[in-house]
UniProtKB/Swiss-Prot annotation:
Protein name: NADH dehydrogenase [ubiquinone] 1 beta subcomplex subunit 3
Annotated organism of origin: Pongo pygmaeus (Bornean orangutan)
Keywords from the named record: Acetylation, Electron transport, Membrane, Methylation, Mitochondrion, Mitochondrion inner membrane, Respiratory chain, Transmembrane, Transmembrane helix, Transport
Protein's cellular compartments: Mitochondrion inner membrane
Gene this protein is translated from: NDUFB3
Entry's family note: Belongs to the complex I NDUFB3 subunit family.
Length: 94
């Protein structure tokens, strides 16, 4: 019996897509080369300087991350409260 549970072989990205050219890692490689050294793992860190990882995060981004959806939920909750209170005003209490 095979114990396959619908798992597929994980596909790893091609290592050649990560380039250090145009990143701060290139400067580090040049400084190391001037001393006769080389960082063979430099390319493994190149992903940090490409794509969505390069956007710097500001205090504003962190503090107001969910503000838009939170404010919308607040408005809906306040609207529901006022609506439910208006229904209660129609009922006479002794």
């Amino acid at each position: 019996m095979a114990h396959e549970h619908g798992h597929h072989k994980m596909e790893l990205p091609d290592y050649k897509q990560w380039k250090i050219e145009g990143t701060p890692l290139e400067t580090i490689q040049k400084k190391l080369a001037a001393k006769g050294l080389r960082d063979p793992w430099g390319r493994n860190e190149a992903w940090r300087y490409m794509g969505g990882f390069t956007k710097s995060v500001s205090f504003f981004d962190v503090f107001f991350k969910g503000f838009k959806w939170g404010f919308a939920a607040f408005v809906v909750a306040v609207g529901a409260e006022y609506y439910l209170k208006s229904l209660n005003k129609d009922k006479k209490h002794h």
